[in-house]
C-alpha cells in the first residue's frame, strides 16, 4: 500500500499527469477493485442527518487511511423507495452523498480522489431503514 501512495499520489505540479492519475483512479473504481468492506452511514427518515453522531468516528478513520495510503473513495448515497417519490428520493440520496463528501473534504481528502454516486430510492436491504444510507468504499 505504501507504494500505491507514491504511484497515485499528487506529488508534482504537472497538471497533465494529474489528469492521467485521476483518469486511472476512475477506471480502477469503475472496475470495482474495492479494498476491504464498504462502510455505511445511516440517516434519519427524509433527512441528510445521521441517525447517530458517533458515526463520524468512522469518517475520521476512513479519511486517515485514505490519506495515509493515497486511496480514492466512492461515496454512494441512497434513500428508501418505500417513502417519498422517485424525484424526492433522487434528491435526498444526492444530499446524503454530498454530506459525506463534505465531511471527507473537511478531513483533508481532496475532491479529486472522491467519486460521488446517487442511487435514488432503493429497496435492497431489510429492514427498510437500512436503505437510508450512504456507502463509502476505498480504492487504490
Language model segments and positions:
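Periplasmic OmpA-like peptidoglycan-binding domain that tethers envelope proteins to the cell wall
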Residues: 53, 78-140
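Periplasmic peptidoglycan-binding/tethering modules of Gram-negative envelope proteins
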Residues: 1-73, 130, 139-140
